[in-house]
């Protein structure tokens, strides 16, 4: 008998509600279909949203300062550092300034993935949320 493990859900009946799905997903159960066994032992529901406008604005201000951009240069959350003239050293300096401003530590692997103001703001909010309570006070 073959065994198949999965972490995804398929909705076939339009009458299925979110609460029914969450109840079913939170319990540990196995369902057998002929030769295949599907087990839902662990399922996480992850909801993410864009960073707060305040965080995006603070990141924009730091980017303008680090890149010595004129005050009238328009920046949006989608503005790419490279399109603003930033090279790899500029990006490192931006990340260092963000770490100092928000009192966070950005892993090198995360820093290399930051290419836009929005990505930086999202990462900052994620790191701030994960900080222990003692560090945030």
Curated annotation (Swiss-Prot):
Subcellular location, record wording: Plastid, Chloroplast
Biological processes annotated in GO: cuticle development; fatty acid biosynthetic process; systemic acquired resistance
Transit peptide location on this chain: 1-48
InterPro entries: ACP, ACP-like_sf, ACP_chloroplastic, PP-bd_ACP, Ppantetheine_attach_site
Modified residues (O-(pantetheine 4'-phosphoryl)serine): 88
GO cellular component labels: chloroplast
Phenotype upon loss of function: Small and chlorotic plants with altered cuticule and reduced levels of fatty acids in leaves.
GO MF entry, a single one: acyl carrier activity
Keyword Amino-acid biosynthesis on entry: no
Signal peptide (UniProt feature, chain positions): none
Carrier domain: residues covered: 53-128
Major site of localization recorded for this protein: plastid
Expression triggers: By light. Down-regulated by sucrose in the dark.
Posttranslational mods: 4'-phosphopantetheine is transferred from CoA to a specific serine of apo-ACP by acpS. This modification is essential for activity because fatty acids are bound in thioester linkage to the sulfhydryl of the prosthetic group.
UniProt keywords, alphabetically: Chloroplast, Fatty acid biosynthesis, Fatty acid metabolism, Lipid biosynthesis, Lipid metabolism, Phosphopantetheine, Phosphoprotein, Plant defense, Plastid, Transit peptide
Coiled coil, from the record: none
UniProt cross-references to HAMAP family, sorted A to Z: Acyl_carrier
PANTHER family hit by this protein: ACYL CARRIER PROTEIN, ACYL CARRIER PROTEIN 4, CHLOROPLASTIC
Biological role: Carrier of the growing fatty acid chain in fatty acid biosynthesis that plays a major role in the biosynthesis of fatty acids in leaves. Required for the biosynthesis of chloroplast photosynthetic membrane lipids such as monogalactosyldiacylglycerol, digalactosyldiacylglycerol and phosphatidylglycerol. Is essential for the biosynthesis of the cuticular wax and cutin polymers in leaves, and for the establishment of systemic acquired resistance (SAR).
Family of this protein: Belongs to the acyl carrier protein (ACP) family.
Protein name: Acyl carrier protein 4, chloroplastic
Record organism: Arabidopsis thaliana
Name of the encoding gene: ACP4
């Amino acid at each position: 008998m073959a065994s198949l493990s999965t972490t995804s859900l398929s909705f076939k009946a339009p009458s299925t509600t979110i609460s029914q799905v969450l109840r079913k997903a939170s319990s540990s159960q196995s369902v057998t279909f002929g030769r295949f066994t599907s087990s839902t032992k662990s399922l996480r529901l992850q909801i993410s949203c864009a960073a707060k406008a305040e965080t995006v604005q603070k990141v924009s201000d730091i980017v303008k300062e680090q890149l010595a951009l004129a005050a009238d240069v328009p920046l949006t959350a989608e503005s790419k550092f490279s399109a603003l003239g930033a090279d790899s050293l500029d990006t490192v300096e931006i990340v260092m300034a963000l770490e100092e401003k928000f009192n966070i530590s950005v892993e090198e692997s995360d820093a290399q993935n930051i290419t836009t103001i929005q990505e930086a703001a999202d990462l900052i909010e994620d790191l701030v949320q994960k900080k222990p309570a003692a560090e945030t006070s």
